[in-house]
A protein has these predicted regions:
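Mature N-terminal segment immediately following signal peptide/propeptide cleavage
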Residues: 1-26
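Catalytic cores of eukaryotic secretory-pathway lumenal/extracellular enzymes that build
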Residues: 5, 23-26, 42-218
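Short coil/turn linker and secondary-structure boundary residues
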Residues: 9-12, 39, 148
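Coupling/switch/interface segments within P-loop NTPase motor domains and analogous charged loops
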Residues: 32-41
């Protein structure tokens, strides 16, 4: 079952978050310059100051809700995803996977160009129907009750694509943690996931024979 979903964070929760940020005991962090021991304190204070005084969550909430959002249950987890139907007669389906620490917000500026390239100077025949899920434990998806790794997440997302969304054939793209999940989609579920594109090389073939030049480079 697929249910429509609207992002609507209660004002009381936003007030609570801002209150915690304002009351943070900055004296508990040593006054050390640079980033050798973690995030620079001065930078972090500037970031938190922006968060409290300038950041407008409702503006970003509205942006997310400008797309069609849904939730569906796979293996007991309610998975949130954005779906944008592609233009044209037969757009391929593209699964976009974010990383850590990340979210579907990473894709908000590329969903429309991918789904409707003709509106951005491209060819309508290159359109994709875009599926952008929040990974389990991220964003608006449920968190698993016990630890799961990228291979299991790939299994869950493949089930979502073929059983819940009726996509027997799809493509996948991912970066960071999403790249590792993409690798497992291509490795374990190639019957349905026909191709992957990754921008982070997290899995490699076993090392083969190397020549003299390659050995010198190492």
């Amino acid at each position: 079952m697929i249910k429509e979903f609207t992002v609507n964070i209660d004002d009381s929760e936003l007030i609570n978050i801002n209150s915690k940020i304002k009351q943070y005991p900055w004296s508990s962090i040593e006054d050390m310059e640079g980033w050798s021991y973690g995030t620079n304190k001065t930078y972090l204070k500037e970031l938190c100051d922006y968060w409290v005084k300038e950041f407008d969550w409702k503006k970003h909430e509205k942006k997310i809700n400008s797309f069609k959002n849904y939730k569906t249950n796979i293996d007991g987890l309610n998975i949130h995803f954005i779906k944008e139907e592609g233009s044209g007669k037969n757009p391929k389906t593209l699964l976009l996977l974010h990383g850590w620490p990340g979210s579907i917000v990473e894709f908000l500026e590329v969903i429309k160009p991918l789904a409707h390239p003709e509106e951005f100077g491209g060819n309508i025949d290159d359109a994709f129907t875009v599926i952008a899920p929040s990974l389990p434990g991220f964003g608006f998806s449920d968190y698993p009750k016990r630890p799961i790794g990228p291979r299991k997440i790939a299994e869950i997302l493949n089930k979502m694509m073929i059983k819940n969304l009726n996509n027997e054939n799809y493509l996948a793209q991912g970066g960071d943690w999403g790249a590792t999940i993409c690798n497992w989609l291509g490795y374990d579920h190639s019957t349905n996931c026909k191709a992957i594109h990754i921008n982070c090389l997290t899995m490699r073939h076993p090392k083969g024979a190397i020549n003299k030049q390659e050995r010198a480079w190492e």
